[in-house]
């Protein structure tokens, strides 16, 4: 299954950034990519999504959504989702 996840994610490579986008080839953002990959592989339904978030991360919403729908692991594996937290300079 992990190989299918990677293959589907790679199919989105040329999709431009679009805030809250969810359409391959049209636009997607960093939250939408894992959502759409999982949805396209039949791993989740449309309830597995978030919306209404701002362009500037608040530092908690994305982490809370990931904790709700995913299981944390110590070391990343093929197909893992990595969450990066930015700090204002």
Language-model-derived ranges and their functions:
Residues 3-6, 46-89:
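...with weaker cross-activation on analogous glycine-rich loops/strands in unrelated enzymes
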Residues 15-16, 20, 31, 53-56, ...:
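Surface-exposed loop/turn and secondary-structure junction residues enriched for glycine/proline
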Residues 6-27, 47-48:
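Active-site nucleophile-His-acid catalytic modules used for acyl/amide transfer and hydrolysis
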Residues 20, 41, 80-82:
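Generic hydrophobic/packing signal
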Residues 22-41:
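Active-site nucleophilic cysteine motif
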Residues 13, 41-42:
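A broad structural signal for alpha-helix termini and local helix breaks/kinks
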């Amino acid at each position: 299954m992990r190989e299918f996840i990677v293959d589907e994610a790679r199919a989105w490579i040329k999709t431009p950034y679009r805030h809250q986008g969810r359409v391959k080839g049209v636009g997607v953002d960093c939250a939408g990519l894992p959502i759409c990959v999982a949805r396209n592989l039949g791993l989740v339904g449309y309830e597995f999504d978030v919306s209404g978030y701002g362009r500037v991360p608040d530092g908690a919403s994305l982490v809370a959504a990931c904790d709700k729908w995913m299981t944390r692991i110590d070391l990343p594996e093929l197909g893992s989702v990595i969450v990066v937290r930015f700090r204002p300079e």
